[in-house]
């Protein structure tokens, strides 16, 4: 490691710790004490990253109370510094941290809500692709098996607690008071970017399995087979139409049975 890289590493470590004694001898003395200058930089870094987390996890802030959230965020930041320059992608591991953190591990509904909020942030950061139409499906695929490619913003979230209900209750017009008798109730959630907002859909077990297989790039036949394991009455026509109406299909590929290859149709 070069000398400049070593210095950067030492300074970065000092910014995230409370006792940066190893870096102080490396700082030039000026008008202000080096320790004081470093404290200013440390505080600015902590405030900036905490503000980023508050913007990504607004409902989690309300669930924990803002002051306690800032304390938890500080603990997270010191152990999980940003790994890339785009702060919009900071916080990926925050929900998992909450599940392990002593002060929040006993609040699984908070951890699940934070996990949902991160998926929302991911969806909003994803690009929008031109959707295909049902007519393209009918025109290009009169026979044979095929696979569907879906919007890159689409996320599936399986929560042990009703995270979407909690999130919705804290939006404008929501009723957070009705969460007083909150019980553990799993939710299967699909969410995707729609313009500058996010759309949500609650799925049953069969629908979740169907969407999950399609996201993995499996063919429609395999997706239907998996869905029917959960519900023999699975309505393929309704499920397929819903994907197109929601503008989630961006590519249709015919699967060549003999070579197991895919041919792009649209």
Predicted feature descriptions by range:
Residues 196-266:
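C-terminal structured interaction module
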Residues 36-38, 189, 217-220:
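A short alpha-helix capping/helix-coil boundary motif
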Residues 18, 22, 71, 163-166, ...:
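A broad, structure-centric signal for solvent-exposed, well-ordered loop/edge residues
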Residues 1-129:
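N-terminal, charged low-complexity regulatory/assembly segments
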Residues 79-206, 265:
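Hydrophobic packing positions characteristic
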Residues 17-18, 173, 217:
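Short loop/turn hinge sites at secondary-structure boundaries
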């Amino acid at each position: 490691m070069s000398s400049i890289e070593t210095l950067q590493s030492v300074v970065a470590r000092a910014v995230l710790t409370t006792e940066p004694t190893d870096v102080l001898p490396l700082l030039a003395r000026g008008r202000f004490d080096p320790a004081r200058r470093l404290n200013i930089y440390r505080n600015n870094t902590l405030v900036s990253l905490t503000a980023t987390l508050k913007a990504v996890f607004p409902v989690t802030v309300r669930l924990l109370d803002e002051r306690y959230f800032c304390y938890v965020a500080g603990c997270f930041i010191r152990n999980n510094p940003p790994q890339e320059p785009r702060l919009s992608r900071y916080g990926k591991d925050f929900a998992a941290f909450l599940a392990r953190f002593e002060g929040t591990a006993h609040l699984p509904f908070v951890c699940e809500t934070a996990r949902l909020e991160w998926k929302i942030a991911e969806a909003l950061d994803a690009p929008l692709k031109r959707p295909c139409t049902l007519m393209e499906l009918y025109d290009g695929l009169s026979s044979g098996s095929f696979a569907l490619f879906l919007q890159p913003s689409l996320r599936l979230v399986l929560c042990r607690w009703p995270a979407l209900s909690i999130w919705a209750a804290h939006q404008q017009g929501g009723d957070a008071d009705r969460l007083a008798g909150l019980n553990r109730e799993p939710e299967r959630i699909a969410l995707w970017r729609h313009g500058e907002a996010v759309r949500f859909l609650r799925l049953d077990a069969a629908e979740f399995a169907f969407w999950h297989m399609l996201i993995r790039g499996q063919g429609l036949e395999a997706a239907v087979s998996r869905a029917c394991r959960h519900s023999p009455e699975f309505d393929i026509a309704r499920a397929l139409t819903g994907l197109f109406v929601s503008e989630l299909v961006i590519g249709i590929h015919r699967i060549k049975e003999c070579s197991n290859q895919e041919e792009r149709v649209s």
